[in-house]
Amino acid sequence: MMIDLNADLGEGGANDSALLQLVSSANIACGFHAGDAGLMVQSVREALKYGVAVGAHPGYPDRENFGRTAMDLPPETVYAQMLYQIGALAAIVQAQGGELQHVKPHGMLYNQAAKSPPLADAIARAIRDVNPKLVLVGLAGSELIRAGQHYGLTTRQEVFADRGYLADGSLVPRSQPGALIDSEEQALAQTLEMVQHHRVRSISGEWANVVAQTVCLHGDGPHALDFARRLRAAFAGRHILVSAQLDAEA
């Protein structure tokens, strides 16, 4: 069995360099919700140094709220913003001798696209128009995954180690109780359940089916690195190989 481990980087976090030695994919902020040109170059160089797959992490133009506030933008505006952000990072990766591998939207853009077909369509279409070989990373079972499949993109269905789930397989909004899992033991158990048995227990107690092809590790918590190491050890003990090159993707 294989699984991809990804982390959102280039957002000013202190753990970026250490996380790059534990994950297989890096999603690098493209300057809208966080990061800037210099940090993008630095992050790409470090990711390539450690042999980590580099992806774009485009978000809403909302630095004040870290891209976590809902916005009601026309799909064509979102399409243009995706071209701008993905294209910028792709150029930086190419200039550093690498190749952009995937795209994972950030924050509220990611969450809204999970449930909004027009928004998901704009994002998937932009990715296809930049490079149809790019992998689209989205919430497992979401509209974003369906849009990517519609446009012929390779998709990678994502689950979250430290986020609570609703009965429909969507994430508990950050504004609600149960959105974040503070217990490392609970997060570890949830991740293994999703990866090995393709299901997650929702905050209401029901099981929701999920397809786990990549696991997101949030690197901004006080115990983020310890948890990442524990998760890697748990995978190794169960003969689960961590790699960005999955055998079969959706």
Swiss-Prot record:
Entry GO MF terms? 5-oxoprolinase (ATP-hydrolyzing) activity; ATP binding
Protein name as it appears in the record: 5-oxoprolinase subunit A
Enzyme Commission code(s) on record: 3.5.2.9
What is the native source organism of this protein?
Klebsiella pneumoniae (strain 342)
InterPro entries given in the database record: Glyco_hydro/deAcase_b/a-brl, LamB/YcsF/PxpA-like
Reactions the enzyme catalyzes = 5-oxo-L-proline + ATP + 2 H2O = L-glutamate + ADP + phosphate + H(+)
Which purpose does this protein serve, as stated in its record? Catalyzes the cleavage of 5-oxoproline to form L-glutamate coupled to the hydrolysis of ATP to ADP and inorganic phosphate.
Record text on subunit structure and interactions: Forms a complex composed of PxpA, PxpB and PxpC.
What UniProt keywords apply to this chain's record, in alphabetical order?
A: ATP-binding, Hydrolase, Nucleotide-binding
Q: Which family does it belong to?
A: Belongs to the LamB/PxpA family.
